[in-house]
C-alpha cells in the first residue's frame, strides 16, 4: 500500500491494532508498526526531494533508539537522526527536511528528530549522554548511504573507543538514578512497565552495558538460560506495554489497577489462556520483572568488577 495520506495511515494503524486484539503476537505488531513508519519516511523523503528538485545527497536518515531496534510501540515517538556530511548539505536541504517532518506529523507520526554532521558525531556531548546511548541502536533508513557508511566505518569506531570509559560511567549513573527514583524495587502497585525496575528499560540498559564493554555477543553456559528467560520476559512485558498504549490511546506505560483487572480477564500474555484475578496475573508480571531486573543487576555487578 502506498501510504500517502493521514487517512490511509490511520486505516493501517487500525488494522494493526485490530490484529493485535485478535491475537497477533506483540513481535509481529511492533514490526508492522515499524515497517509502516519506515515506508512513510522513505516515501516522504522522496516526495519532498522531488518537490524541491533536490536529491538528498549528503543526508542519511537513521533510525535510533527503539525504532533503531526495529521496535515501535503504538504511541511511541519516532526517533530519527538526520545525519549530514557537512554543514553545506544541512543548509541546502533545509526546506526538504522541513517538508519531510511536516508530512510525517500530518500522517500521525510523533517525530523526535536530532540533526548532526559527521564532524559533530566525532564528539560525545556530556550533557546529552542518552542521545549517544540511543545511537548504539542505529540503522540506515533513507537518503545517502555513503554518509552512513562514513559514520560506521570512519567516525564511530574511533569515537566509541575514545569515549568508552565515559559512556560506561554515565550509563551506570543514569541507570542507578532511574532505579532509585522507583525505590530500587520491582514491587510497585501500579508499575511503569517501561521505566520501573523490572521494566523494559532494564533489559535495554543491560544490553547497552554489554555493548559499551565490547561484550555484546558474549553468551556462555548459564548465560544461555538467562538470555532465554529474559527474552520471554521482554515478550510478556512488551505485550503489556502494547496493551497499555491501545487501552489509553497515548504513550502511557503505567499498569493501573483498572488495567490490571482487564489484562487478567483477557489472560494477557499468559500462554495457558487460563482466566485469573488481577493479583494472580500480577504474580506473572512480577516474575518476569524479576528476571529482567536480575539481569540488569548482574550487568551492573560485572561492570563494577571490570572497572576495579
Pin down the residues of each PLM region.
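A nucleotide- and high-energy phosphate-metabolite-utilizing enzyme signature
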Residues: 1-308
Amino acid at each position: 500500500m502506498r501510504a500517502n495520506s493521514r487517512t490511509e495511515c490511520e486505516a493501517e494503524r487500525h488494522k494493526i491494532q485490530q490484529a493485535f486484539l485478535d491475537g497477533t503476537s506483540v513481535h509481529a505488531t511492533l514490526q508492522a508498526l515499524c515497517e509502516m513508519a519506515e515506508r512513510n519516511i522513505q516515501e516522504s523523503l522522496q516526495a519532498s526531494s522531488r518537490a524541491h528538485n533536490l536529491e538528498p545527497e549528503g543526508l542519511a536518515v537513521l533510525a535510533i533508539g527503539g525504532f533503531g531496534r526495529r521496535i515501535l510501540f503504538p504511541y511511541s515517538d519516532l526517533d530519527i537522526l538526520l545525519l549530514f556530511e557537512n554543514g553545506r548539505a544541512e543548509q541546502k536541504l533545509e526546506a526538504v527536511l522541513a517538508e519531510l517532518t511536516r508530512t510525517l506529523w500530518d500522517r500521525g507520526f510523533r517525530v523526535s528528530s536530532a540533526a548532526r554532521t559527521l564532524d559533530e558525531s566525532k564528539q560525545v556531548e556530556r550533557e546529552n549522554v542518552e542521545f549517544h546511548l540511543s545511537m548504539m541502536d542505529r540503522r540506515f533508513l533513507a537518503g545517502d548511504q555513503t554518509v552512513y557508511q562514513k559514520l560506521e566505518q570512519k567516525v564511530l569506531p574511533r569515537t566509541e573507543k575514545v569515549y568508552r570509559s565515559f559512556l560506561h560511567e554515565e550509563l551506570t549513573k543514569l541507570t542507578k538514578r532511574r532505579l532509585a527514583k522507583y525505590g530500587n524495587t520491582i514491587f510497585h502497585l501500579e508499575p511503569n512497565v517501561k521505566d520501573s525496575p523490572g521494566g523494559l528499560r532494564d533489559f535495554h540498559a543491560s544490553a547497552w552495558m554489554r555493548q559499551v564493554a565490547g561484550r555484546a555477543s558474549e553468551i556462555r553456559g548459564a548465560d544461555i538460560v538467562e538470555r532465554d528467560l529474559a527474552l520471554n520476559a521482554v515478550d510478556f512485558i512488551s505485550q503489556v506495554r502494547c496493551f497499555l498504549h491501545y487501552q489509553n490511546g497515548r504513550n502511557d506505560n503505567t499498569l493501573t489497577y483498572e488495567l490490571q483487572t482487564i489484562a487478567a480477564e483477557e489472560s494477557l500474555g499468559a500462554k495457558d489462556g487460563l482466566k485469573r484475578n488481577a493479583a494472580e496475573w500480577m504474580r506473572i508480571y512480577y516474575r518476569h520483572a524479576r528476571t529482567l531486573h536480575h539481569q540488569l543487576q548482574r550487568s551492573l555487578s560485572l561492570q563494577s568488577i571490570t572497572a576495579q
